[in-house]
Swiss-Prot record:
The keyword Membrane does not apply. This is Putative histone H3.3-like type 3. It comes from Caenorhabditis elegans. Its main location: nucleus. The lineage of its organism: Eukaryota, Metazoa, Ecdysozoa, Nematoda, Chromadorea. It comes from the Eukaryota. Putative variant histone H3 which may replace conventional H3 in a subset of nucleosomes. Nucleosomes wrap and compact DNA into chromatin, limiting DNA accessibility to the cellular machineries which require DNA as a template. Histones thereby play a central role in transcription regulation, DNA repair, DNA replication and chromosomal stability. DNA accessibility is regulated via a complex set of post-translational modifications of histones, also called histone code, and nucleosome remodeling. The gene is his-69. PROSITE patterns: HISTONE_H3_1, HISTONE_H3_2.
Length: 127
């Protein structure tokens, strides 16, 4: 016991030493963003961009597959495939925008098939 009547103070480890002791013992968790943060970042990125979103070769195969039903051995210029892809993506982006508005109208943030069906029905599309 000390002459003043108090017990001697314990030495506290420095902040850096404590941090190192914790890090050495455990594996650091990877950083995770809150749900929706990455999605919003992707939405902003794709809204800024003007490039095509669908891969060219899979789209070209799809066009050729559909064209087979109309006529055998059809040939396409690359500019024709590109024009079809531009028009298709323009249509799909607009449809998804309308679908999102239908989901928001229903007080939801997640789009569902019924939202897309409603959007197409309002637009007057069939099938």
């Amino acid at each position: 016991m000390c002459p003043g009547g108090k017990a001697p103070r314990k030495q506290l480890a420095t902040k850096a030493a404590r941090k190192n002791a914790i890090v050495v013992g455990a594996v650091k968790k990877p950083h995770r963003f809150r749900p929706g943060t990455v999605a919003l970042r992707e939405i902003r990125r794709y809204q800024k961009s003007t490039d095509l979103l669908l891969r060219k070769l899979p789209f070209q195969r799809l066009v050729r597959e559909i064209a087979q039903d109309v006529k055998q051995d059809l040939r396409f210029q690359s500019a024709a495939i590109q024009a079809l892809q531009e028009a298709s993506e323009y249509f799909l982006v607009g449809l998804f925008e309308d679908t999102n508005l239908c989901a928001i109208h229903a007080k939801r943030v997640t789009i569902m098939p019924k939202d897309m069906q409603l959007a197409r029905r309002i637009r007057g599309e069939r099938n």
